[in-house]
Amino acid sequence: MKSADQLMSDIQLSLQALFQKIQPEMLESMEKQGVTPAQLFVLASLKKHGSLKVSEIAERMEVKPSAVTLMADRLEQKNLIARTHNTKDRRVIDLSLTDEGDIKFEEVLAGRKAIMARYLSFLTEEEMLQAAHITAKLAQAAETDEKQNMKRGNG
């Protein structure tokens, strides 16, 4: 029987091999849709929260607001987002998805889902349930760890 250390090494190597294969496919899929990973992050944030200030997106992305402003320029040129003045402070600009932006976001997700479906088709239904449970647990652990690091001032 393998030791915990050997199992962790096996998992790490398998995940690395999987990500090295999937990542270029995901990037190519986004490129075909005319969206960069950073732009997808903005679209996803707006989809989830409805409307956000440039500063809020910058904080989530850990970049300067000027970087988000440039990205917003490109997304607005493509009619994927709309800018409006904040109702409480007219100096503040809020970003939101347009109908076209919502459609584009769903198209990008569909492309990513198709890639994942190809790989997940090798699993049985039981294995998919296990994989869903394990990855959700790992994602939750990562989020908890990130929040703890931020509280300690390490994030």
UniProtKB/Swiss-Prot annotation:
Gene Ontology CC terms: cytoplasm
Gene3D superfamilies the UniProt entry points to: 1.10.287.100, Immunoglobulin FC, subunit C, Winged helix-like DNA-binding domain superfamily/Winged helix DNA-binding domain
One of the record's GO molecular function terms: DNA-binding transcription factor activity
What the entry lists under InterPro entries is as follows: HTH_MarR-typ (IPR000835), WH-like_DNA-bd_sf (IPR036388), WH_DNA-bd_sf (IPR036390)
HTH marR-type domain boundaries: 4-140
What does the entry say induces or represses the expression of this protein? Answer: Part of the mdtRP (yusOP) operon. Negatively autoregulated. Induced by fusidic acid. The mdtRP expression is decreased during stationary phase, even in mdtR mutants.
Q: Report the protein name in the record.
A: HTH-type transcriptional repressor MdtR
Upper lineage: Bacteria, Bacillati, Bacillota, Bacilli, Bacillales
Q: How is its activity regulated?
A: The binding of MdtR to the mdtRP promoter region is severely inhibited by adding excess concentrations of fusidic acid or novobiocin but not by actinomycin or streptomycin.
**What keywords are annotated for this sequence in UniProt?**
Cytoplasm, DNA-binding, Repressor, Transcription, Transcription regulation
Its biological purpose is as follows: Repressor of the multidrug resistance operon mdtRP. Acts by binding directly to the mdtRP promoter region, leading to the repression of its expression.
Q: Which residues bind DNA?
A: 54-77
